[in-house]
A protein has these predicted regions:
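Hydrolase active-site cap/lid region
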Residues: 143-196, 213
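Short beta-strand/loop motif that positions the catalytic acidic residue
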Residues: 210-211, 217-219
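The serine-hydrolase catalytic nucleophile loop
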Residues: 62-75
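Catalytic histidine-centered segment of alpha/beta-hydrolase-like enzymes
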Residues: 250-262
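Conserved alpha/beta-hydrolase "acid-adjacent" motif
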Residues: 224-230
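N-terminal cap/lid segment of alpha/beta-hydrolase-fold proteins
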Residues: 2-49
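Conserved alpha/beta-hydrolase
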Residues: 75-96
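Alpha/beta-hydrolase active-site loop
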Residues: 100-119
Length: 274
């Protein structure tokens, strides 16, 4: 298979590793199905020496991007278990467009997955955090059979949740003009001003459609954004198919995922994707 990104000229070329012949690190742009340029990074990780290793595609949380230290730390940890692809969602970092806070971002993930498979990996798993977790769940439901395992960390179960102070602040950031200015200039995140129309499939509606693809739901019992009814609702919706890890003392998303947890997620993804 070709390892060139579809629909866009690469900013950097793929160079094989001198010892293994496998591709070295690549940083480039893809174009999504709706024409948005998305920055993406490929790291061969453990796949340099293990041709059977999977590629793990990481979907970051809201306000993240490929250069955020917490995103890079997670990517480095997961690279011990396979190749890694990270990308900046639309409206984040150097990607184009504006964030739709989980709706059109499914197209960003789809482009990254297609590109990741182009490097010749037989297995691919998605690992999403917070907003990115909702995206990997919806993608797996909408495009069955395109991934081999799905891990969702700190995902909401339902839309429009305002039951915690951090989520009330996030809704102000997204829905108010002054909030979007803070997002643009303070958080390097450009947010679309339009409401969802139609309202996308919610994570809890997506989960029953994912089986038989292996599904992992990870959530901290000190998550300040989404309390424990969210992961429990997701697990219940799976009808017993999903694995649920409730992590003692863990907060929210990448910032709260310590190295030991990242290792466990990487090990799970490598085992369950094949």
């Amino acid at each position: 298979m070709s390892n060139r990104p579809a629909g866009h000229v690469a900013r950097s070329t793929v160079r094989p590793d001198d010892e293994t012949g496998r591709p070295g690190p690549v940083r480039t742009y893809l174009r999504t199905a709706d024409g948005v340029p998305v920055e993406v990074v490929y790291d061969p990780g453990a796949a340099v020496y293990d041709p059977d290793a999977p590629v793990l595609v990481i979907a970051h949380g809201f306000t993240g991007d490929v250069d955020r230290p917490h995103v890079r730390r997670v990517a480095a940890g997961l690279a011990r278990y396979g190749a890694v692809v990270i990308f900046s969602f639309r409206g984040h970092g150097r990607s184009g467009g504006r964030s739709t806070v989980g709706d059109k971002e499914v197209l960003d993930l789809a482009a990254a997955l297609a590109w990741a498979r182009g490097f010749g990996h037989a297995r691919v798993a998605t690992v999403g955090f917070s907003m990115g977790a909702s995206v990997v769940l919806r993608h797996a439901a909408l495009h069955p059979g395109t991934v081999d395992a799905v891990a969702a960390v700190s995902s909401p179960a339902r839309w429009y949740y305002r039951g915690t102070a951090p989520m009330r602040r996030l809704h102000w950031l997204v829905t108010r003009p002054e909030g979007r200015l803070v997002g643009r200039y303070g958080l390097r995140t450009r947010i679309h001003h339009r409401d969802w129309d139609p309202i996308p499939l919610s994570p809890v509606e997506a989960v029953p459609l994912i089986a038989p693809t292996p599904l992992l739901i990870v959530h901290g019992d000190r998550d300040g954004y989404f309390p424990l009814d969210h992961p429990r609702m997701l697990a219940d919706a799976s009808g017993g198919h999903a694995e649920l890890w409730l992590e003692p003392g863990m907060g929210h998303a990448e910032h709260a995922a310590d190295d030991a947890l990242v290792d466990r997620i990487g090990d799970w993804a490598a085992r369950r994707s094949g």
